């Protein structure tokens, strides 16, 4: 039988995900078998669990904090927005239906049943389950249909913590309002409050904390400091709307990333942040970097349409002829082909469309979706790299180019034992692959970065800076939480 703890928030982006990860790592460090859990998540950033099903990137990262293999039961319901208020609903890792909010709401009992099934499995297999809520736990206009917050805590009699973000202001009002608006049976579940993202001297909060404890009858368990150095994968593509660049501006290597309107799995870029400067470019921008990446997208045909409208194919070809390196991942790989065939308009309302014609390849869209943890041997310049990744794609690609990866496990282009395409343009190089997470393979990542560094007379890089940073961040934040928060009321 597991102990259940739930982290809920006064708002979105209050820090629930990182607090949950911190608690997971604290308990894992104590030798417990721990599982993360989020009943319902909405994200275009997903990973593949051990059952070859999709879960949100946040629950994947939290599984790293727990030091356990990710499972579809960590995130039984995943909503992947498709546009026009429609989401693809993923249940236990597999596509269920495309639904709007009203359809989803009417099927609440079915989804609740699936959530309960996952909770029963986790209850049997783990010592602790650290649950994360979604958004605000008290959207009073949505409470009767909310299956992501305290209704789920009540099912398992979880001890709940309320997290409030002081950085955005109004923290005490948001705490008081949230608690007072909750139904009494859910209010009783909250055992403590965490004030998150604080900058400055904690003494200035003393009077406010005393007052909020008096008004609510719930103790403030701790104040967690704001820390810009904490680097964990983002799950929300909204962060990209205002982001122009990130990474190491002193690295000597610049990577341009095409800013797709429906970008997905942009965490593919995270491993590059330590060894390159990453700059997003729009369709009408010039290519200024050493490497150009076409990331994943929820709508390859629509992105191909916009790229062609801006004559981006001409820019890419010129860039390759000048010695540039172009890399397409998943949907980004599809748009680099000759044609995208979508006769029934399954992928978008665009239908069939020409790609950028970098590769002699055609992609066909149908009803099937590939979700696989994959591995194989990547060959480039007479070098072979043993690589791992994960595939989440609709569309099968038939390429006449040299394949990039000989598959040992997975699906790849079209189930023929190969993945991707590779093509040289003089000193230029074009690479396409369905392997998300390709840059997590540090030997391949370093090889690509070092191609540019050698051209510029810079020293080569070695080692796995990304993996080291994730572990360092998880351990560091666990220490911060343990130091800042009184965990005894939670039984930790």
Swiss-Prot record:
Family matches, as CDD domains: CobQ_N, GATase1_CobQ
Gene Ontology MF terms in the entry: ABC-type vitamin B12 transporter activity; catalytic activity
One GO-annotated biological process of the protein: cobalamin biosynthetic process
Metabolic or biological pathway, per its Swiss-Prot or TrEMBL entry: Cofactor biosynthesis; adenosylcobalamin biosynthesis
Gene3D superfamilies according to UniProt: 3.40.50.880, P-loop containing nucleotide triphosphate hydrolases
Domain GATase cobBQ-type: start-end pairs: 252-444
Keyword Hydrolase belongs to the record: no
Keywords for the protein's UniProt record, in alphabetical order: Cobalamin biosynthesis, Glutamine amidotransferase
Superkingdom of the organism of origin: Archaea
Keyword 4Fe-4S among record annotations: no
Role summary: Catalyzes amidations at positions B, D, E, and G on adenosylcobyrinic A,C-diamide. NH(2) groups are provided by glutamine, and one molecule of ATP is hydrogenolyzed for each amidation.
Family listed: Belongs to the CobB/CobQ family. CobQ subfamily.
Protein name: Probable cobyric acid synthase
Protein source organism: Methanocaldococcus jannaschii (strain ATCC 43067 / DSM 2661 / JAL-1 / JCM 10045 / NBRC 100440)
